[in-house]
Amino acid sequence: MEKTIYVNRPASRTWNRLGVNEAAVHWDTDAEALLSNEGFTAVSGENAPLRIEAADGGAAYGRRVYTVTAEAGAELTVFEVCTAAQPLAAELRLTAAEGAHLRVVQLLNPTRGAVLRHELSAQLAEHAKLDLISLQLGDGAVYADHQISLAGDGAALRVDLGYLARRSDTADIDLTVEQLGKSTVSEIHASGALMERAKKVFRGTIDFKRGSAGSVGSENEIVLLLGEDAENKTVPVILCAEENVEGSHGATIGELDADTLFYFASRGIDRAAAEAILARAAVERLARMAEDE
């Protein structure tokens, strides 16, 4: 039987009245069944990309778990595609050993009315690197929880996240980066568009732990509101337990203004077409970065 569970809790809570301390999801925990649990290991000198396709398999409340390990000096690109017509939970566990480089291209794409829960965890050792490109383009509800630890000195992370939410869809994202090692670097870029009655929450937390001296972290989000009833909540947070660090965050939220509409109209493009063009532009940069159809 379905009950309410709470996911995407940030590292630091804020006022409850803001409605961003957690996401409530209707989920049948008793019916949840493990559909697959697979592991992959990359070694230095092997560069063939790994493709993961996580689907519901026709079962409601299925769960799929994937563990990817990059050994010292290895380089690996992972393409992960999650599709769901039924409620689906997927988990991707990443480990990068010393000097390893992981590049993850992720597409979260539920069909209309479906619920997709996705969890990503990553542990980066000394001088390891993770590049994450995450696209959320589905027609249903996506709850994405990314927990990344820069544990080793000199570990580096870049995240490029894009979303497009329409109708009454939900995009709920929690991204927490713990910077533990010395001279670690994190860089987060998020952008997307909300149409009609769509709702989006993005919680981006950079957490400088004691001992992370010399580390740098930044996050930025650009949101385009294309629906009068669209609802956006952006929660950038920087936590600091170390003095010699540098952190920054920012957000830009814009709408389709009269000047932009006039520009499109003068070229024979009506409002609906203009919104479609701008919504596509909000995420197509990431699609080009993905380098995979």
Residues of each region from the PLM?
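Conserved beta-strand/loop scaffold segments within soluble protein domains that form the structured core
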Residues: 35-262, 266-269, 283-285, 290
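Short, Gly/Pro- and small/polar-rich lid/capping loops
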Residues: 1-33
